[in-house]
Amino acid sequence: MLLDELVRTTDAVASTRSRLAKVDALAQLLKRLDPADIPAAVGLLTAKPRQGRVGVGWRGMSAAMGEPAADPGLTLADLDAALDRLQALAGAGSAAERAATLRGLTAAATEREQAFIGGVLLGELRTGALEGVLTDAVARAAERSVEAVRRAAMLSGDLGSTALLALTGTAAELDAVGLKVGRPVQPMLAGTGASVTAALETTGEASVEYKLDGARIQVHRSGGDVRIFTRTLAEVTHRLPEVVEVVRGFPVHDVILDGETLALGEDGAPRPFQETMSRFGADAARTTVLHPWFFDVLHIDGRDLLDEPLSERIKVLEAIAPAHRIPGEITADPEVAGRISRDALAAGHEGVMLKSVGSLYAAGRRGSNWIKVKPVLTYDLVVLACEWGSGRRTGMLSNLHLGALDPAGEYGEPGGYVMVGKTFKGLTDALLQWQTKRFQEIEVRRTAGTVWVEPVTVVEIAIDGVQQSPRYPGRIALRFARVKGYREDKTAAEADTIQTLRALLRP
């Protein structure tokens, strides 16, 4: 299939709010795919290419962008093969080969395809095809039940392979997909609550647990063989030998565990999130020791626990790994839940998770059975630039470039602004229309897809924290930034400083 056909479908999907229209467009595309293209297509449609990140940044992407092809000729298989080559590059000479591969890829792409490829490589692709929508589309295209497709995708951990099976196999083969030790499943996800009291009203009696600022891990053990997977189901066993040894010590033969791992200081307090994540990089040094903590068990010695209540799963977990169970208590009392939340924050953790004791493990699903509660941080930042939107936001300025005040010039000009991140989340239609008009009135220059503006507009941004990042001059980046609203009552000189944000980093 030509890449152009997939790109046009993603544009159509992104431009409509109708779920039925999205599902129909995607189902028609899936029916036309060659079976060999199905896994790659599903990865691209969900903005999660099967190769993951391939080591290309915006500078490399910008340098590779040349004159686009006049007519579509690039195939989906061509793009998938190029991503494979980019992922495999390492060592001496890899930078030059990566640049050559990128130039060859973009030269064969039309302007529309170049924008799509850039989104894929930079992790900024927004296709409008969320996994739930695409799951429905697979079911429609294959004439299978949505529940059968969803269950197979959750338990296989791979919507691409599930789509291939649904579209080319039998209903019985799809129904036969089940939990298997050694094959990761999509993790259960949590909703967000405003307070522990509000969360308890939803969950009823709950396991109230510390929410650690670590890396989600899923650990599979069969005998002496232990495998560790990330929340995106990438295998990282070889990077975490200390976790492997801990799990080998548990009194079980087969087990699947869900939990987190993080770095701790000598005082037992959590170290900065970036120290934990440094162990997951390609060149990770093992100077930082990671400690595993578990909050769920999905299987033990031939017994699947997915469909057993959390209260039972907790008993199993406490029997096999009491020293590595995430701190928490079962309660229906808001005062007790509040105390646990305060204790978690005092210990340096993010907040708490409240989990209904009767809940089953819904792999890959986000719902009201698990609710996270943590304090929200808000800061006043300055808009430095804004990127043109795509899909439904075509023609509107969308993704904001955010800067913090640097009064002393520690990271640039005194009194200037240091970029700390981007976000398009939280923008309503009204805000999109307002900022599209406003920012063109204060435009100072344009680059490809971006309008740079006078640094005079203050916007209130909610964040979950900051993390170390070499991408920006201040060496930090916002975590989970979203727009609360514009502060027309404030001047840019009143914005929060880069020093204030850097103080959020743990020492």
UniProtKB/Swiss-Prot annotation:
Q: Which reaction does it catalyse?
A: ATP + (deoxyribonucleotide)n-3'-hydroxyl + 5'-phospho-(deoxyribonucleotide)m = (deoxyribonucleotide)n+m + AMP + diphosphate
What Gene3D superfamilies is this protein classified in?
Answer: DNA ligase, ATP-dependent, N-terminal domain, DNA ligase/mRNA capping enzyme, Nucleic acid-binding proteins
Which cofactors does this gene product need?
Mg(2+)
Record: residues binding ATP: 209, 216, 231, 260, 295, 366, 372
Q: Which GO terms describe its biological process?
A: cell division; DNA biosynthetic process; DNA recombination; DNA repair; DNA replication
Catalytic site: 211 (n6-amp-lysine intermediate)
Q: Name one GO molecular function term.
A: DNA ligase (ATP) activity
Question: Pfam families from the xrefs?
Answer: DNA_ligase_A_C, DNA_ligase_A_M, DNA_ligase_A_N
Keywords recorded for this protein, A-Z: ATP-binding, Cell cycle, Cell division, DNA damage, DNA recombination, DNA repair, DNA replication, Ligase, Magnesium, Metal-binding, Nucleotide-binding
Q: Which domain of life does the UniProt lineage start with?
A: Bacteria
Q: What is its EC number?
A: 6.5.1.1
Q: What does this protein do?
A: DNA ligase that seals nicks in double-stranded DNA during DNA replication, DNA recombination and DNA repair.
Q: What HAMAP family does this protein's entry cite? A: DNA_ligase (MF_00407)
NCBIfam families hit by this protein:
dnl1, PRK03180.1
Family recorded in the similarity comment: Belongs to the ATP-dependent DNA ligase family.
Protein name, as recorded: Probable DNA ligase
What is the native source organism of this protein? Pseudarthrobacter chlorophenolicus (strain ATCC 700700 / DSM 12829 / CIP 107037 / JCM 12360 / KCTC 9906 / NCIMB 13794 / A6) (Arthrobacter chlorophenolicus)
Chain's gene name: lig
